[in-house]
């Protein structure tokens, strides 16, 4: 679809709009991470709005965004991600449909030549591909096939050990003594060292990449001490420079910053300090920033980085860059491919057509609550959405959530969160289980042991396949039998490869749950005895299993007729 005008003028109306009617007999998957993550997708009300990564977007959009959708009947709808000012919505109130449109208005990034902030194109093209396939799995594979693969796995330590981050317990008040105390407590409480992530506010001024000398008087010695304890160490960074920093002064002098806004320095973000964004369209600016990160590694021995932000929603309206952004999501792509990809031990939170990145793609911050509204029940739907979008190396948010607003998990929530997380590709801790209760500590330790016995023997093969083909490590249950309609709405189970079904308990107070097993012979896996050969289950079938607080229901396929 195209729309043309005789002259380059601001257009107050959409150039083109495509609507796909959603029939009641099919279920939809893909699109994006949402603040209220529902599976299947037609359960959600996704207001029409800009389609690019957001930090709590106005239409509920999150930081991981794709441009394809598949349904349970094998239909694939894919939109060109390079469409300027692409908007999308699905099943908005009173409208049972999916809508795609390039619009000449929105929020965040706007066309730089437009005084009004609206779009400025003589011709705008909306490219949409619709194809029919035999089933939803085949449609998903068709959607993944044109995407770039990383061709290398993230470092093995991510899978074999855990990430421990300072965020949920210290937030911005982190200090050197707090960091070392966390590392020592991990070992003292029987957990293995892994990757220790020093989160926000280790710097005195954002962008200078220098430890706050009051909070971290001896950073190099600290990192050496953490290494001796068996940890690799990563630092939190973002593409923003604090205006009072020497880095910002240097970048401003060199022309490495995004301009625009009134005044030019205005940049809305979650912090209170005035900041400027690095111009990632400027190769010299990117090289300057990457060199500074590499210099920091050499000077103090840090092993990698947690790359936060990168969403174009933070850029000022009328953003002026060295090279005009072709579409807003390009800023995210530059952050991931040009910066984060330079560091093997790394993770990002924002993604849009960045499946070629070889690090971890994490879920957004979760609240310390049970529900699907950004709590425990949103983890599996987000994991499965990542699988459909081509991000197999998913990092779930920290066990127990972020402990914002005075929240803190009780024993039950902490245990169930750990059980839901430990068989995902990577597990991340921040709230120490031993600070919740002795029971929580013991159950979380047991969950880690389950990971070692169930996932680790399989992870190398699955991760190698994911690196070359984007085949998900953790898969929707319909992946095992894509023609079985019973699998289409299961939002609280997932498969590991083709032979394990994981069914965490995510309902508060539940001590049993229904589990669906696809075709084949299934045996329950038990922590102490291993596979229970006494009670085989022949699928497809629903069963009810006991799930006391210490138990994570797991089933292993021993024979398949598929």
Annotate each PLM feature.
Residues 340, 344-346, 353-364, 388-396, ...:
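Catalytic core of carbohydrate-active enzymes
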Residues 55-57, 64-66, 150-153, 184-186, ...:
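Generic recognition of flexible, low-complexity loop/linker segments
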Residues 154-169, 264-277:
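N-terminal small/glycine-rich loop or linker at the start of catalytic domains
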Residues 8, 63-67, 72-74, 161, ...:
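Extracellular structured ligand-interaction cores
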Residues 1-156, 177-188, 480, 546-560:
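Catalytic and substrate-binding clefts that recognize carbohydrates or anionic sugar/phosphate headgroups
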């Amino acid at each position: 679809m195209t729309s043309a005008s005789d002259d380059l003028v601001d257009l107050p109306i959409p150039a083109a709009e495509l609507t796909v009617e959603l029939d009641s007999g099919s279920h939809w998957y893909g699109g994006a991470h949402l603040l209220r993550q529902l599976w299947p997708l037609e359960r959600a009300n996704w207001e029409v709005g800009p389609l690019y990564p957001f930090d709590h977007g106005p239409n509920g959009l999150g930081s991981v965004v794709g441009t394809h959708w598949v349904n349970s009947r094998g239909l694939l709808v894919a939109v060109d991600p390079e469409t300027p000012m692409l908007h999308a919505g699905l099943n908005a109130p009173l409208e049972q449909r999916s809508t795609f449109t390039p619009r000449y208005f929105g929020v965040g990034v706007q066309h730089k030549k437009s005084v009004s902030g609206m779009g400025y194109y003589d011709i705008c093209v909306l490219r949409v591909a619709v194809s029919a396939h035999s089933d939803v799995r085949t449609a998903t594979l068709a959607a993944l096939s044109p995407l770039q693969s990383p061709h290398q796995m993230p470092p093995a330590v991510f899978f074999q050990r855990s990430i421990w981050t300072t965020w949920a317990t210290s937030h911005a008040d982190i200090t050197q003594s707090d960091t070392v105390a966390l590392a020592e407590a991990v070992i003292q409480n029987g957990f293995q060292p892994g990757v220790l992530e020093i989160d926000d506010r280790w710097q005195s001024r954002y962008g200078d990449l220098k430890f706050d000398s009051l909070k971290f008087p001896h950073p190099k010695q600290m990192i050496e001490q953490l290494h001796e304890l068996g940890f690799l160490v990563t630092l939190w960074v973002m593409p923003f420079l604090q205006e009072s920093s020497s880095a910002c002064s240097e970048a401003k002098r060199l022309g490495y910053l995004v301009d625009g806004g009134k005044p030019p320095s205005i940049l809305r973000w979650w912090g209170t300090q005035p900041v400027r964004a690095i111009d990632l369209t400027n190769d010299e600016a990117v090289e300057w920033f990457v060199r500074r990160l590499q210099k920091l590694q050499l000077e103090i021995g840090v092993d990698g980085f947690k790359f936060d932000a990168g969403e174009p929603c933070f850029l000022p309206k009328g953003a002026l860059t060295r090279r005009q952004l072709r579409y807003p999501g390009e800023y995210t792509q530059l952050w991931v491919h040009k910066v984060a990809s330079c560091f093997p031990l790394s993770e990002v939170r924002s993604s849009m057509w960045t499946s070629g990145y070889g690090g971890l793609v994490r879920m957004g911050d979760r609240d310390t609550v049970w529900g699907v509204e950004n709590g425990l029940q949103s983890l599996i739907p987000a994991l499965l959405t990542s699988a459909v979008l081509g991000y197999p190396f998913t990092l779930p948010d920290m066990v127990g959530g972020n402990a914002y607003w005075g929240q803190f998990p009780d024993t039950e929530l902490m245990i169930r969160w750990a059980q839901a997380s430990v068989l995902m590709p990577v597990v991340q801790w921040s709230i120490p289980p031993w600070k919740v209760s002795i029971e929580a500590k013991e159950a979380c330790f047991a969950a880690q042991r389950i990971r070692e016995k169930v996932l680790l023997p399989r992870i190398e093969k699955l991760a190698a396949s994911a690196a070359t083909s984007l085949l998900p490590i953790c898969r929707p249950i319909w992946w095992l039998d894509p023609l079985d309609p019973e699998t289409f709405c299961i939002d609280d189970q997932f498969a590991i490869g083709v032979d394990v079904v994981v069914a965490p308990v995510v309902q508060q107070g539940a001590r049993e749950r229904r589990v669906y097993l696809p075709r084949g012979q299934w045996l329950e896996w038990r922590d102490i005895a291993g596979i229970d050969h006494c009670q085989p289950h022949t699928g497809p079938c629903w069963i009810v299993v006991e799930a006391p607080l210490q138990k994570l229901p797991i089933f292993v396929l021993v024979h398949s007729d598929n």
